Amino acid sequence: MDASDFVEDEAAIAQQKLSNEEYKIWKKNSPFLYDLVVTHALEWPSLTCQWLPDKESPAGQSYTQHRLLLGTHTSGQDQNYLQFAQVQLPTTGADGASNSAESRLDLKQYDEDKGEIGSYSATTARLSIVQKINHDGEINRARYCPQNCDLIATRSVTGKTYIFDRTKHSNTPSADGVCRPDIILEGQHKEGYGLSWSPLKQGHILAASEDTTVCHWDINNYTKPNNTLQPSATYTGHTAIVEDVAWHNHHESLFGSVGDDRQLLIWDIREPASAPKYRVEAHTGEVNALAFSPENENILVTGSSDKSVGVWDLRNLKVKLHSLESHTDEILSVCWSPHHATVLASASADRRVNLWDLSKIGQEQTPDDAEDGPPELIFVHGGHTSRPTDLAWSPHMEWALTSAAEDNIVMVWRPSKAVIDTGNEELTPDDLE
C-alpha cells in the first residue's frame, strides 16, 4: 500500500464515520420530521424504483396496498431479477391527515430481521417482494408503460432494452436463470440509464445510451415470429454519453435528452434524427437527468454534476429561468410531484433528497432561515447513508416518495405536513412562469 492508498482509506473511513453520525441525528429527529418512514434492506441494491399506478384498500383493514417496481445489481455474484414489491402502508397518517403523537412513526420499533423501521400504533408498514423475473445482467432502469402497467421496459448492461409482460411470467423465477423478455429492443451497443415511455402515444419508448445515441422504438411494430425489434429512429446529436431522456408530457412529437457533453437537446420526431430542434449548453458539468413538468407545457428541469438543478422555459432556452442550489455533490435524478404543480424532488450523491417549491423562489428570509438554504428548498431527506440511485413520487399519497440507494436500502417516506406546509394549493401552472 502506497501513501496515496493510505490517504484514500483514511478519507473513506472519515466519510463513513460522518455518514453514520449524520444518520444517528436523522433517526433521532425523524419522529418530528415525518408522517411515514419505511426502510427496507433488499438482498441486493436496486438502481431503479418506481411506484406502480394501482392501489388496493382491503376491507376492514387500516392499511392500503401499493406496488413498487425494483431491480437488482449483483455485480455478477448472483442472478439478477426484475422485481415487484408489495408495500402495506397505514391509512392513519398516510392517506389520512392524522399527525397525533400516538399515530406518529415510532423509530424504536425496528425489525432487525426485515431491516425495517416504521409503524403506526397497531399497524406496521411492510414491504415484501411478490414477483421476480430473471434478467440478463443488472437492471440500470425499469419503467412501466403508462397505458398498460403490466408492460415493463428495462435498460440492461448489455446495451439492449427489454420488454416484459408481467402477466406472462410466474411470480417465482425459473430455476435455469434464463432471461426471457417478450421483446428485445436492439440498436444500441452500450449500456445506459435513460428510459422513457410516451405518456401520449402507447407503445412508443426512448432509451439513452453510453454510445452517444437515443433510440426510439414503436413496439406496435413488433411481430411475433422474431422477438427483436429495430428502432424507428436513432438520434445522434450528442458528442458524449447520453445520461437521460424524457418525452414531453403535452406534445407527442417532442422529447428531450441530456448528456456528459453538458448539452440539453430538444427533439421533434417529425424532423431529421441528426438535427435537434434546440441545443443549449445547460450546465458547467455533465447533465445527468431531466424532467418535463407534468402541468406546465413550457417548463422543464435538468440535474447536473455541477451540483445544481436548472429550471428552463422552452420558449426561451437561451436563458436559464433559475438554478436550484443546495446540494453539495452531483445531481443524480429529478422528478416532479404529481400533486403540486410547482414542487419537485432531486437526489444527489451527497446522500440527500431535496424537495423544492418553485413558488417560493424570491421569498424573503430571516438570516437564520437563509443559513438552512434558499426559500424554495422546503425539505431535506437525510435518511440515506449511501448514494441514492433513483426516486419517485407516489401517485396516490400526497408528499410520499420512494428512494433506493447503493447500500441495498429502499425507503418509502412522507414528510410531516406540519414541516412542509407549503400553502401552495391555490397556485396555477402559470405561476411557474
Curated annotation (Swiss-Prot):
The keyword Cytoplasm applies. WD repeats lie at residues 134-174, 187-227, 237-277, 282-322, 326-366, 383-433. Residues 368-372 are annotated as: Interaction with the histone H4 N-terminus. Keywords: Chromatin regulator, Cytoplasm, Nucleus, Repeat, WD repeat. One of its GO terms (cellular component) is Rpd3L complex. Its main location: cytoplasm. GO terms for biological process: chromatin remodeling; regulation of DNA-templated transcription. InterPro entries: G-protein_beta_WD-40_rep, Histone-bd_RBBP4-like_N, WD40/YVTN_repeat-like_dom_sf, WD40_repeat_CS, WD40_repeat_dom_sf, WD40_rpt, WD_repeat_RBAP46/RBAP48/MSI1. It is found in: Cytoplasm; Nucleus. It holds the Pfam family CAF1C_H4-bd. GO terms for molecular function: histone binding. Regulatory subunit of the histone acetylase B (HAT-B) complex. The complex acetylates 'Lys-12' of histone H4 which is required for telomeric silencing. Component of the HAT-B complex composed of at least HAT1 and HAT2. The HAT-B complex binds to histone H4 tail. Belongs to the WD repeat RBAP46/RBAP48/MSI1 family. This is Histone acetyltransferase type B subunit 2. The gene is HAT2.
